[in-house]
Amino acid sequence: MNWKVERGSLADAETITKFQLDMALESEGTILDADTVIEGVRAGLSDPAKGTYYLVLEEGGETVGSLFLTKEWSDWNNCWYWWIQSVFIRAEYRRRGAFTYMFEEVRRYAISEGAASLRLYVDRTNVKAQNCYKKQGMDECHYLMYEESI
């Protein structure tokens, strides 16, 4: 299959929102508020400082997946770490190369921009996603994540 990767725009907000609602339910059993999610997606699409959405499209132009890319500055290493977030590929396109193609495009871009690494976090129970990331050459790192809701 021939894939294409594009940056998301405001015109893609509803598609990305649907992906996020589906991803939260599927991967974590979480039902998100659709109004909150679409506003969050629109905010991300409207403000490049928040990050960049990337879409993977099939040959016919249909959007089959997306991810959100953010950047973290490292004062320790004087470089950027790029974070992949909100990954979703429609079920019927999984294991057909859509994510691999999108990931490789983002990796090429990260290398060309001098990023030190690509990072992401994944739910501990989402073993399928963990295996997918390992197939891309990613390794589990030594950091644990902590959070305090405020």
Specify the residue positions occupied by each region the protein language model found.
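Conserved GNAT acetyl-CoA-binding A-motif
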Residues: 110-121
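Conserved beta-strand in the GNAT
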Residues: 62-71, 88
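Conserved beta-hairpin
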Residues: 53-65
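A short helix-loop-beta-strand connector motif used in the catalytic cores of GNAT acetyltransferases and
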Residues: 44-55
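Conserved GNAT-fold acetyl-CoA-binding loop/helix
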Residues: 21-43
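Conserved active-site alpha-helix within GNAT-family acetyltransferase domains
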Residues: 100, 124-144, 148
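Conserved acetyl-CoA-binding loop-helix of GNAT-fold acetyltransferases
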Residues: 89, 95-108, 131, 135
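A short beta-loop-alpha structural element at the N-terminal edge
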Residues: 4-18
